[in-house]
Amino acid sequence: MDIGYFLKLMTEKNASDMFLTTGAPVYIKIEGKLYPLGNTGLPPGMVKKIAYSLMDEGQVPQFERELELNMAIAVPDAGRFRVNVFKQRGEVGMVIRAIRSRIPSIEELNLPQVLKDVIMTPRGLVLVVGSTGSGKSTSLASMIDHRNSTTTGHILTIEDPIEYLHKHKMSIVNQREVGLDTHAFHNALKNAMREAPDVILIGEILDAETMEAAIAFAETGHLCLATLHSNNADQTIERILNFFPESAHRNVLMNLSLNLRGVISQRLVKGHDGRRLPATEVLINTPMIRDLLRRGQVHEIKAAMEASLEEGMESFDQCLFRMAKAGVIEQEEALRAADSRDGLALKFRLSEGGSGEHDPYADFSNGAPSITHGF
């Protein structure tokens, strides 16, 4: 089996991932959906043979010792790929992810223009949140590329794994991958300050130690970007608090009120053409939000966001309403993805009743721009 052929096909089809497992055909993932490449399952031993052909002399014994391995490969006319090799049911399995060098712009992704202001802020903490596969990495890469193309500085990323390769433009971009460029995530964080960064990207916050490091970077005059697994802005604050004991919550909220710059929440919805589009919720740390954080009134953040459209904030349901009214997505798709299905349904009914009020969400008058690079 010529793995190079399949990797080139993966690139041609703009697939994000490829799956190789014994007993099943090769699958590729495009726009979040799996497609088989043929009908014949891979025979026993085939995936192991392919995996070992991609490893160097040191990686083979490492895999046999640890039973899992991460590595990066480059294939002419196909590009760069991240390969995860593992054991399953006594056989070897592989997942190959494309590492893209072409980074879509904020405009191409139809992201809120306020993100350009957010990424250009000199200091503070910016969180991009959403579920796995919601396009967080793509949006972050787009934001970083905007800053890289606009101003000078040193951008340092700590990722597991690297998903987009950034070129040096106006800024210097150093990308460190856990397992390849550093042995451990926390080791890289501890040494980050010695590398004189202006912007630090933390691939994902999973514990209190990483959260404390992110806040510390922001406190010391850096712009810190990070991702979290949460569904919306107020849930993000609750998730952060849950990293810490209750006795520390007041101090954490004070630190967030002083250092948080914004929370961008994202989920993907299906457009009329079947492509996945980002629906975004934007929280900006305005004086009103800062005061709510200080007082611990997290439950009031959603209402404050919905009342602050002119400051660049927007809730998920407002974004979904706007996209549906512009014909970008179906109403049922908007309702499916809504935080409050009943609340959004009521908003649709009121808008269809012809109240005569100006619709503050209808700024998709010409529909969403064509997205060449999907999530």
Model-flagged regions — what are they?
Residues 1-375:
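Short, flexible helix-loop junctions that flank or precede catalytic/ligand sites
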